[in-house]
């Protein structure tokens, strides 16, 4: 019997991370409901909140020592809905439904590629040979980041009020591009591998505080900035990964 389970059932400590994951799932579905009603800002806010909760559940599970196979499966299913299905439907309702034939196909591509990315992650989680992970990188764009990037046209529309950003042609092309990034084999930075120098800690904390304030005061400009920064980091991550692999190759050559 699992140590978290006794004759009286499962402990509250074991349920907390799963409750957070379930709440993230609810936020994703709520985003779709808000999108159906045309409440675009609130719809995006629900998906963003789902992303925050998704970032917390695993860390809280490790902190409480409450990791479980059930929690991992629930997290994957929640991510698929909150960052694949829900963003695809929101983009379709906001713009892609105006495409004569291919708008729904683009929305499907985003949802399906998110599912495929998560399936690949689950299939490789126990694999012995994972070059990207061993070097501190993700493989492809993670699902929450992919959802945030897919919403860039909506950020631009909310910031500028320009309906050109809502035209289905560029939105469809952008949606397909993000779908491809999610299932790509490109190395991308993993937050768990980022280390901050001791003498930069206070600056980092101040930056996080300012970022939080910016998200409250000017959320769409801030999210647009963060999404653009993430896009710029993709080629940097690729170059950094190549350097790591070259150093490893040189070290193996010296060892021989």
Where are these regions (language model features)?
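Alpha-helical transmembrane segments of polytopic integral membrane proteins
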Residues: 29-32, 49, 53, 87, ...
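Hydrophobic, membrane-inserted alpha-helices
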Residues: 26-30, 86-88, 205-213
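C-terminal membrane-associated helical module and adjoining short loops/tails
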Residues: 1-5, 135-256
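C-terminal ends of transmembrane helices
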Residues: 59-68, 115-133, 183-192, 239-242
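Topogenic membrane-insertion module of multi-pass membrane proteins
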Residues: 1-55, 237, 256
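Short, amphipathic, aromatic/basic-enriched membrane-interface segments that mark the entry/exit
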Residues: 10-18, 70-78, 138-139, 190-200
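Helix-coil boundary and interhelical linker segments in multi-pass alpha-helical membrane proteins
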Residues: 30-45, 81, 85-108, 151-171, ...
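Multi-pass membrane catalytic core of lipid/isoprenoid biosynthesis enzymes
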Residues: 14-21, 63-121, 153-154
């Amino acid at each position: 019997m699992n140590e978290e389970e006794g004759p009286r059932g499962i402990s509250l400590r074991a349920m907390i991370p799963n409750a957070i994951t379930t709440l993230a799932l609810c936020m994703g579905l709520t985003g779709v409901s808000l999108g159906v009603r045309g409440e675009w800002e609130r719809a995006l806010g629900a998906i963003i909140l789902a992303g925050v909760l998704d970032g917390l559940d695993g860390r809280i599970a490790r902190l409480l020592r409450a990791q479980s196979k059930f929690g991992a499966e629930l997290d994957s299913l929640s991510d698929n809905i909150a960052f694949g299905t829900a963003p695809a439907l929101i983009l379709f309702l906001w713009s892609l439904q105006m495409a004569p034939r291919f708008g729904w196909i683009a929305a499907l591509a985003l949802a399906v590629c998110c599912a495929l990315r998560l399936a690949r992650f689950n299939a490789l989680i126990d694999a012995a040979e994972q070059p990207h992970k061993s070097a501190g990188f993700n493989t492809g764009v993670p699902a929450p980041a992919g959802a945030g990037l897919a919403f860039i046209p909506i950020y631009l529309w909310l910031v500028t009020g320009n309906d050109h950003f809502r035209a289905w042609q560029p939105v469809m092309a952008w949606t397909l591009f993000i779908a491809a990034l999610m299932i790509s084999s490109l190395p991308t930075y993993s937050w768990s591998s980022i280390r901050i120098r001791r003498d930069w800690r206070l600056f980092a904390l101040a930056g996080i505080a300012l970022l939080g304030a910016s998200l409250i005061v000017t959320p769409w400009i801030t999210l647009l900035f963060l999404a653009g920064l993430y896009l710029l980091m993709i080629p940097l991550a690729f170059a950094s990964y190549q350097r790591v692999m070259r150093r490893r190759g040189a070290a193996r050559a010296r060892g021989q």
